[in-house]
A protein has these predicted regions:
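Repeated scaffold domains used in trafficking and secretory/extracellular systems
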Residues: 6-16, 50-54, 65-82, 113-124, ...
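Short, conserved, GDST-rich strand-edge loop motifs in beta-rich repeat architectures
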Residues: 24-45
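Eukaryotic tandem repeat interaction scaffolds
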Residues: 105-167
Length: 222
């Protein structure tokens, strides 16, 4: 495991040839100054980028209109769907589906027993959500937004599941409580612990053959 960036990383976004991430650049009068960097795999270079590149990667072509509808576009979770629509999740559990024109077509909540969803991921025509405070994953029908399946709960294999990353027919769950990556097969629903770290795992992404985790101390290549 190799540390590639030291400090508080907010979010990592995969690109076709690397990753983009947002991070805490400085704290001034108790307010965080956010910076953005891009790593290009071909040459290994780190490049400072402007927030418009970050927003385009996160929200798609209509990023300006989408970002204006977010209370905080750094903490907002998003999925750009194949049809150009954008699904958004706020920290308070508010969820919205925006059309390709960034006009809201559905608004609701992703909550389970009073717990707010912490991350979302797309698999086929289903939306998966993690609930860190309840140690569960829920599957929703993306058309009806009805809950279809639950994994976890009592004697849960998860411990504060904070991040989701779909890879093939599996989803990698980042557990901030147990400091483990847990793999869930989305066809058989089998679960096993994939890897353990010395710090809480906030996020996992894989781009090509490169796997990254965000820990409290920074961004790592594993």
């Amino acid at each position: 495991m190799k540390k590639v960036f030291s400090g508080e990383v907010y979010e990592v976004l995969p690109t076709s040839g690397g990753i983009i991430f947002s991070y805490c650049k400085d704290v001034i009068e108790e307010k965080a100054l956010v910076g953005y960097k891009m790593i290009t795999f071909e040459n290994g270079r780190f490049t400072d980028i402007v927030n418009t590149i970050y927003l385009l990667t996160k929200f798609g072509n209509n990023y300006k209109s989408v970002a204006m509808q977010c209370d905080n576009y750094i903490t907002e979770k998003s999925i750009v769907l194949p049809n150009g629509k954008v699904f958004l999740l706020s920290q308070d559990g508010t969820a919205r589906l925006l059309g390709a024109d960034a006009v809201s077509v559905w608004t609701g909540e992703l909550k389970y027993r009073g717990c707010n969803a912490t991350d979302i991921a797309l698999y086929k025509n289903a939306l998966w959500a993690s609930f860190a405070d309840c140690n569960v994953l829920l599957r929703y029908n993306l058309t009806t937004m009805r809950e279809e399946l639950r994994i976890g709960g009592n004697k849960s294999p998860f411990s504060k599941p904070s991040g989701l990353f779909v890879e093939g027919d599996t989803v990698m769950v980042s557990n901030a409580g147990s400091s483990k990556l847990t793999e869930v097969n989305l066809e058989t629903y089998s679960v096993f612990d994939y890897e353990e770290f010395e710090e809480p795992v906030k996020q996992y992404v894989k781009v090509g053959d490169n796997r990254f985790v965000v820990l409290e101390s920074g961004l790592y290549l594993i």
